[in-house]
Regions:
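Disordered, low-complexity "stalk" and linker segments at domain junctions of extracellular
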Residues: 1-76, 91-100, 188, 195-198, ...
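Repetitive beta-architecture junctions, highlighting loop-to-beta-strand starts
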Residues: 2-3, 61, 82, 127, ...
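Non-cytosolic beta-sandwich-type ligand-binding/adhesion modules
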Residues: 5-10, 15-22, 27-29, 302-414
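Surface-exposed loop/turn elements that mediate protein-protein interactions on large endomembrane-trafficking
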Residues: 5-16, 29-33, 75-101, 133-141, ...
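Viral virion structural and adsorption modules
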Residues: 63, 129, 174, 268, ...
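Beta-sheet-dominated scaffold domains
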Residues: 70, 107-297
Length: 414
């Protein structure tokens, strides 16, 4: 136990010790000067019986923990679901009783996850996100920079750190905070519902909630390919829980994939291993847990389809006449009439004004080539959506696509 130095006339500062007597010379170093806080504090850390915290992150040489359960002076455990506590600088397991942040006390929300980026703490509840600025070395100068409602998370594994910022999956999309603002990575890229984008069953509402209506999306970041991997369910809590989306930060595009994960299996959270590989453990219910890593390499995929958004050319109310589409591509396989179109948001590629472009993919022997696609006659429309059926064999790449059209200035949709 600690005993403070005391002063006695004729002896000076000393500590009584039964074995060795008194210290004659005063000690310049005291408990307070060494540790930065008084020895009289009753609470120094979270580690008593049944004391816990449910979220944590290390930033600016401090540990931040949230959603804590602490023992009160009465000996009873008291829960602070909306409290964030922080350690002393460089003392990552020392939490003083007055080192806490109550950003929104009394809003009945509990913190689910913490992350840090660009001198900010991102504190997630189920229904909102707090962005707290901790750039100042003085604690009293920390402040709540932004509160964003309806962008919370349901699990810690729905949040991940990337070199581009903090990414997370909320109820209505996948978001990124880049140190300046929050943006929706899925906006106008993944359909909200079947009717909102294409005639495909791949849409956010059915994928996010799954057959069991459980919201447990797991998110990981692969630093090698600079990609996000968004898995439907690590707990097999839905039919086809292996369904996944992959986001490429370099192209800003999403890819739907059912071959990365195995349905009816159970997965650990993602980690980044010693070799910078995104890894996780998988259990199929019968054998031992097997650890696997994500490898961003090309593999065979069947029945691939590509859809553009409904393109209005910047003039949504005007009638346009579309003459041709020019595609720069290379392919190891041939494909007959792979491009189709739908008009005016109707999502029909065979009727209601939709149809097939004339023009075939050729085997270019891994060299870039240009394909000109034409409709049977110029298409008059407000907007156009293009669908592409990938070759059934081989590897293909599309570099760019341009549409030749003319706005009919004196004709507007009625």
């Amino acid at each position: 136990d600690h005993k403070a130095w005391s002063y006695q006339d004729g002896k000076g500062y000393h500590v009584v010790s039964g074995a060795y007597g008194n210290s004659i010379e005063p000690n310049l170093d005291t408990y307070t000067t060494i540790n930065g806080f008084s020895p009289d504090l009753k609470f120094l850390g979270i580690g008593g019986a049944n004391e816990i915290y449910k979220a944590s992150v290390v930033s600016n040489r401090r540990t931040f923990v949230a959603n804590v359960k602490l023992k009160a002076s009465s000996g009873e455990l008291e829960k602070f679901g909306d409290r964030i506590m922080f350690s002393e600088i460089g003392k990552f397991d020392t939490f003083l009783e007055h080192n806490f942040i109550d950003v929104s006390k009394g809003d009945f929300g509990e913190y689910v996850a913490l992350e840090s980026y660009a001198d900010r703490i991102l504190a997630f509840k189920h229904n909102l996100l707090h962005i707290i600025n901790i750039s100042s070395p003085t604690v009293s100068n920390w402040y709540l920079e932004e509160t964003t409602r309806h962008l919370g998370v349901n699990h810690q594994f729905s949040v991940t750190k990337t070199k581009n910022g903090i990414a997370w999956v909320s109820d209505d999309g996948c978001y990124l905070y880049d140190g300046n603002s929050v943006r929706n990575l899925t906006d106008r890229k993944i359909a909200v519902s079947k009717a909102s984008f294409t005639d495909s069953d791949i849409n956010w509402n059915s994928w996010y909630r799954g057959s069991a209506l459980k919201k447990d999306i797991m998110l990981g970041y692969d630093p090698i390919s600079n990609s996000l991997i968004m898995m439907r369910s690590p707990n097999d809590s839905s039919t086809n829980s292996n369904k996944a989306f992959v986001y490429d930060f370099d192209s800003n595009g999403w890819t739907y994939n059912t071959g990365i994960f195995t349905d009816s299996s159970y997965y650990t959270n993602f980690i980044t291993d010693f070799n910078n590989n995104l890894s996780l453990g998988v259990f199929d219910g019968s054998t031992a847990i097997e650890f696997k890593k994500f490898l961003p390499i090309s593999l065979s995929q069947s029945d691939q389809e590509f859809y553009t958004k409904d393109i209005d050319f910047g003039f949504p109310s005007s009638i346009k006449k579309v003459y041709k589409v020019v595609v720069t591509y290379k392919s190891d396989g041939a494909e007959t009439t792979p491009f189709k179109y739908a008009i005016d948001g109707k999502q029909s590629f065979s009727s209601d004004g939709g149809g097939t472009f004339t023009g075939n993919f050729a085997d270019t022997s891994d060299k870039w080539d240009v394909l000109t696609l034409t409709p049977s006659s110029p298409v008059s429309c407000q907007s156009m959506q293009i669908k592409f059926d990938a070759p059934s064999a081989g590897i293909f790449e599309i570099n760019d696509m341009s549409i030749q059209y003319r706005v009919i200035n004196n004709k507007e949709a009625t």
